[in-house]
């Protein structure tokens, strides 16, 4: 226990009502957040002589101050606890590292509805289907739906300004509601209804309706229409045959847990209308000495009660671990959702199969993660030995990317003891320098990155500069001039020059811009971690540069073609459904646009291709 903190005096001031408490260390940092039905009883338990675990002993030894917030109910306390955990990220709490919102498929409420991927708040009028585990799953589903039920996926701004159908109509991926007469209101509405039923898991209803329409078309001797509907039926059947479907039409999340060597994996399986939409593995940050029960309880609370996660609530949550606060969690989630949410820990039948699947996936993902961590730990230990450092807890690497000096982008990637910390990767757009001056670009990004206050935990042990002596000289100059409140002498600056022909294993490392560098053996674990972070930085920089270049190119390509002024540009984009449609068009198709001659069409075609 802290010698300064007077626990007896503090406990006399604490109420027995429900609430949340925050524990601070001597530096004023929140080190733990907890909730309690009875604050006095819960807080008193921290200051007994026989504490439950070493983790609690270590926590109590650092307490300098405790803040208490009284709430009306336990539910309020639970919500506030998880909001505080998200805000303060205390080191003695189990922390959910991935707090991204989940993507949904959005069916708009327009006269002619469109399909799109959606993340975030659901303000737009329409229907939302999901959640899906990631953007890839949504894009894959949208592409599939476009082939089976060709309703539009274009933005409203494009849809409203069309006078002729775009390429999607020509290849059968859209019914073309943007142009009057191409599709009847009845047919478009019918296809939208099929999409709605399909995404709701009612495949049987879709097939029943399609079969009835096919038979009617055949009876009416409309054989082309019957053949088209037959193809649609076959496409729906092919999709549904591949899916693992429960006849019960379950709407639930299934959570499996694996715990080993101080690391936990929580695997969440998303099931909607009996269909497995996908899954995702999470590796929460677990303080040493934490029991598995606390890991599961804290994860589940953070997963559903923090921010956007509240909008992804299913009707039922299956767990393979019995929670002490199961009733409280279910009540809190039900209150948030405005409907009853069930939390089940002993399922049977299909639900037990789901849980076994989630548990197996959690165990498999944990084995893979532990193997990867073992590798990265060995590599960082080897690098620390080479650099004569006690340990490397954080490392950052910089790279510059541009095309002939244009659209310069600098990247910064971050590794910690577990490897890449992608949530902290950053890109910097570089401006105000001579085009192609990589030294000036490096100088600028380092000043922007380090010329300000930095939390102690965010100060890197090693800063890797990709580019060799010249770039390292820039880094040394920047750090020599820094006037910052943190210890600028803490990071070790290390330059890395690529080998001959940029071959991996031939890199040269530099501590100083002058003199000879040194190399590591090609099989050195220390070299492997340097190559890993350098390649990550390089890829991150190139990715940002390509996005920036594409953005500029999309707005300026047509402007550079002689004979294509604002009116012709507008006409070309309008008739071709945007720049991508124009890029895919032939010379003959471009020449059909009003005001575009055969000669100009050829010039436009070759300008876009080359």
UniProtKB/Swiss-Prot annotation:
Keyword DNA damage on entry: yes
GIY-YIG domain: residues covered: 16-94
Location(s), subcellular: Cytoplasm
Primary location class: cytoplasm
Name of a matching Pfam family: UVR
Swiss-Prot/TrEMBL keywords: Cytoplasm, DNA damage, DNA excision, DNA repair, Excision nuclease, SOS response
Signal peptide positions on this chain: none
Superkingdom of origin organism: Bacteria
CC terms in the record's Gene Ontology section: cytoplasm; excinuclease repair complex
Any one Gene Ontology molecular-function term assigned to this protein's record: excinuclease ABC activity
GO biological process, one term: SOS response
Domain UVR: 204-239
Binding partners and assembly: Interacts with UvrB in an incision complex.
Family: Belongs to the UvrC family.
Record's function text: The UvrABC repair system catalyzes the recognition and processing of DNA lesions. UvrC both incises the 5' and 3' sides of the lesion. The N-terminal half is responsible for the 3' incision and the C-terminal half is responsible for the 5' incision.
Record's protein name: UvrABC system protein C
Upper lineage: Bacteria, Pseudomonadati, Pseudomonadota, Gammaproteobacteria, Enterobacterales
């Amino acid at each position: 226990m802290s010698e300064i903190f007077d626990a007896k005096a503090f406990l006399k001031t604490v109420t027995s009502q429900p609430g949340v408490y925050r524990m601070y260390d001597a530096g004023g940092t929140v080190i733990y957040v907890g909730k309690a039905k009875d604050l006095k009883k819960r807080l008193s338990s921290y200051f007994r002589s026989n504490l439950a675990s070493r983790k609690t002993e270590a926590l109590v030894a650092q307490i300098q101050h405790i803040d208490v917030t009284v709430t009306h109910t336990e539910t309020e306390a639970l919500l506030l606890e998880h909001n505080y955990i998200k805000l303060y990220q205390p080191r003695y709490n189990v922390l959910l590292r991935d707090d991204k919102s989940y993507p949904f498929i959005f069916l708009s409420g327009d006269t002619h509805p469109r399909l799109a991927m959606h993340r975030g708040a659901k303000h737009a009028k329409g229907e939302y289907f999901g959640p899906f585990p990631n953007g890839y799953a949504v894009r894959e589903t949208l592409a599939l739906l476009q082939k089976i039920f060709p309703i539009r996926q274009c933005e409203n701004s494009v849809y409203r300004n069309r006078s002729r159908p775009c390429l999607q109509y020509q290849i059968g991926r859209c019914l073309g509601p943007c142009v009057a007469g191409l599709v009847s209101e009845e047919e478009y509405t019918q296809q939208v209804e099929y999409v709605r039923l399909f995404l709701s898991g009612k495949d049987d209803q879709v097939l029943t309706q399609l079969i009835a329409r096919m038979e009617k078309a055949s009876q009416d001797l409309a054989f082309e229409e019957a053949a088209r509907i037959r193809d649609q039926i076959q496409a729906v059947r092919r999709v549904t045959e591949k899916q693992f479907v429960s006849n019960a039409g379950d709407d639930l999340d299934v959570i499996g847990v694996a715990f080993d060597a101080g690391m936990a994996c929580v695997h969440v399986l998303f099931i909607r209308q009996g269909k497995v939409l996908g899954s995702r593995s999470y590796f929460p940050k677990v303080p040493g000495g934490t029991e598995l029960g606390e890991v599961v309880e804290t994860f589940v609370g953070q997963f559903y009660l923090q921010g956007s996660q509240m909008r992804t609530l299913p009707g039922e949550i299956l767990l393979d671990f019995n929670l002490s606060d199961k009733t409280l969690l279910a009540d809190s989630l039900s209150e948030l959702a405005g409907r009853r949410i069930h939390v089940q820990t002993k399922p049977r039948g299909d639900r037990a199969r789901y849980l076994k699947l989630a548990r197996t996936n959690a165990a498999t993902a944990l084995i893979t993660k532990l193997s990867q961590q073992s590798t990265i730990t060995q590599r960082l230990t080897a690098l620390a030995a080479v650099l004569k450092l006690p340990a490397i807890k954080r490392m950052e690497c910089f790279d510059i990317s541009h095309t002939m000096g244009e659209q310069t982008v600098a990247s910064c990637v971050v590794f910690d003891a577990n490897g890449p910390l992608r949530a902290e990767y950053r890109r910097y757009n570089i401006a105000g320098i001579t085009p192609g001056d990589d030294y000036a670009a490096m100088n600028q990004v380092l000043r922007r990155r380090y010329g300000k206050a930095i939390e102690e935990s965010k100060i890197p042990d090693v800063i890797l500069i990709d580019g060799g002596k010249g770039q390292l000289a820039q880094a040394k100059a920047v750090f020599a001039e820094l006037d910052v409140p943190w210890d600028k002498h803490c990071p070790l600056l290390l330059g890395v020059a690529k080998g001959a022909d940029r071959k991996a294993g031939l890199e040269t490392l530099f501590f100083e811009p002058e003199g000879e560098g040194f190399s590591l053996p090609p099989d050195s674990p220390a070299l492997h971690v340097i190559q890993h972070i350098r390649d990550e930085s390089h890829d991150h920089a190139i990715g940002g540069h390509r996005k920036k270049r594409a953005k500029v190119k999309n707005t300026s390509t047509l402007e550079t073609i002689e004979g294509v002024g604002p009116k012709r540009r507008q006409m070309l984009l309008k008739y071709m459904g945007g720049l991508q449609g124009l890029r895919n068009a032939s010379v003959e198709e471009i020449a059909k646009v009003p005001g575009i001659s055969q000669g100009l069409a050829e010039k436009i075609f070759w300008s876009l291709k080359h």
